[in-house]
Amino acid sequence: MIFLIGNSTSNYTVCFPIFILEDTRALKFPYSMLQALEFVLTFVSFYYVIKCCYVAIHIKSFHRNLTVLLIILMIQWFEGLLSNILIKPYETGFWPLGEHNTQLKQWWTKDYSKMIQVPNLSTFPNFFLGGFLKWHYILSMITTLLVMSIERSFACYFLTDYEKKSRNGLFFMLVVGQTSTNLVMGYLFFFNAAHFAVGFSIILSTNIIAMGIFTYVKHVNRQVNRAIEDFSNPSLYCLPARFQVRENVRCFQMITKVIHAGLFLILTACFVNLFMYLELTPGLDPLLNLIFESAINLNPVVIVPTLLGSVNAWRNFTFSSGVCLGFKAQVRLKIIKVSSVSIGNDGAKSDRTRKETDAYFDQLNSAWI
């Protein structure tokens, strides 16, 4: 949706990744039930995000860099949640956007007469802040595959010692690079500095590059794994390399399934967006708009179960089992401490006995002499 900010003499445009505003039907029955459903699914998404972070922290299945990248990806959902909270009142017409009191429906236009006019960004700061946060969140989701592909390429290159080292420099390079890139792209998209075709090309090329890196690294890892299994390259046959290759295999399986789930969400969003754009079923716009927004804001409902189900160590994990594991770990630690104390006491007793024995034989030797 394109907004014209300013007046006839001084103005600029702002682009929003939304399609409908002030659709008051969303607050009336039966479409109000959809808002209740979205509210419930938001809590479900919150549960899955917390669970994914908890599992990734407590069950070490991947290198620390990849684990932290996954956690950052999950935490960024709260950015999308905040943007949805800021935009939703205007989207449903609960709060009017200035003098507009009718449904606003638009996707992209270069015609100034069709743009939604707003005098200033400061007039509705919450609304426009939510739009920028939403752009940043969408771009963060899009560039995650590229960042993970680069991280796995380093894991494949430093095969023999990647797991032994923290690689903090690589981690900060990836995080800072992704964050700065998303901020710049979000600024350009929000202020409509990049044409729609240019922005779409950037997003598409980013994913094509990521898929190319992912496919190449997966192929190289498969060759290394075959060489290790066949003992054809003795220099590669070491435990760290074997361990890293297997970790890469698990990671590729996980990313492949997540990509399929992500493509399902993207295609669903594009399909319903096309329906709304062509106005094929205008009476179902609240339902279609909810599906479109859910594909963006409620993606953990699909992504997280797919992610957890693709890793054997994560598949059957529950919070209750995690609490039990933590309790068992504490009990085991106490047993080890008690054993260490008892061993220390036994050692002290044995030292005292040895000293007494040595003193006894020294006295016996002196008396014998």
UniProtKB/Swiss-Prot annotation:
InterPro entries: 7TM_GPCR_serpentine_rcpt_Sre
Top-rank taxon: Eukaryota
PANTHER family named in the record: SERPENTINE RECEPTOR CLASS EPSILON-45, SERPENTINE RECEPTOR, CLASS E (EPSILON)-RELATED
Lineage: Eukaryota, Metazoa, Ecdysozoa, Nematoda, Chromadorea
Transmembrane segments: 1-21, 39-59, 67-87, 127-147, 169-191, 195-217, 258-278, 291-311
Protein name: Serpentine receptor class epsilon-45
Gene giving rise to this polypeptide: sre-45
Listed Pfam families: Sre
Membrane topology category: Multi-pass membrane protein
